Amino acid sequence: MIDSANRADVFLRKPAPVAPELQHEVEQFYYWEAKLLNDRRFEEWFALLAEDIHYFMPIRTTRIMRDSRLEYSGSREYAHFDDDATMMKGRLRKITSDVSWSENPASRTRHLVSNVMIVGAEAEGEYEISSAFIVYRNRLERQLDIFAGERRDTLRRNTSEAGFEIVNRTILIDQSTILANNLSFFF
């Protein structure tokens, strides 16, 4: 039960061809975003988020085939993240402070983004994007976490140097049981 039915439907269809220039721009935006996260340049990364951001990571459960549509929690149910700009600012303050025990010492991350598909356009200058990701995180000496999944984003074109802002991000993680000590980083 991911988000609203209409938004989820666009991600299930084969995307129409897009201009190679747009595809390249979107991919470069995601590579830049990954670099900012990997380099812990969180304030610069935060500038890529729209003021009306919705950052959502539903909980995944293992279901039998007939209940597979209920595999992910919905927007009015429990979630790992269900954040707006205010919540994201709080997370940013925490992750960059010296008092956050979950990130002091800091995690070392590597964000890999691939399979970037522009699957639709909501409005003029807004694009629905599906991408696959792997986030590798190493913390302390022996703590190692690997997360894989799909991100479903709405990007809005803007006049910033990056060219886009993230309006909506839904993170569909492949794991149903998260073995990591915390989720104190960004996807």
Curated annotation (Swiss-Prot):
Pathway, per record: Aromatic compound metabolism; benzene degradation; catechol from benzene: step 1/2; Xenobiotic degradation; toluene degradation; Xenobiotic degradation; xylene degradation
Keywords of this entry: Aromatic hydrocarbons catabolism, Dioxygenase, NAD, Oxidoreductase
Species this protein is from: Pseudomonas putida (strain ATCC 700007 / DSM 6899 / JCM 31910 / BCRC 17059 / LMG 24140 / F1)
The keyword Lipid biosynthesis is annotated on this UniProt entry: no
Gene: bnzB
Family: Belongs to the bacterial ring-hydroxylating dioxygenase beta subunit family.
Free-text function comment from the UniProt entry: Catalyzes both the oxidation of benzene and toluene. The beta subunit may be responsible for the substrate specificity of the enzyme.
Cofactor: [2Fe-2S] cluster; Fe cation
Cofactor binding, note field: Binds 1 [2Fe-2S] cluster per subunit. Binds 1 Fe cation per subunit.
A matching Pfam family: Ring_hydroxyl_B
GO BP of this protein: 3-phenylpropionate catabolic process; toluene catabolic process; xylene catabolic process
Domain of life according to the entry: Bacteria
E.C. code: 1.14.12.3, 1.14.12.11
UniProt GO MF annotations: benzene 1,2-dioxygenase activity; toluene dioxygenase activity
Family matches, as CDD domains: ring_hydroxylating_dioxygenases_beta
Name under which the protein is recorded: Benzene 1,2-dioxygenase subunit beta
Keyword Transport on entry: no
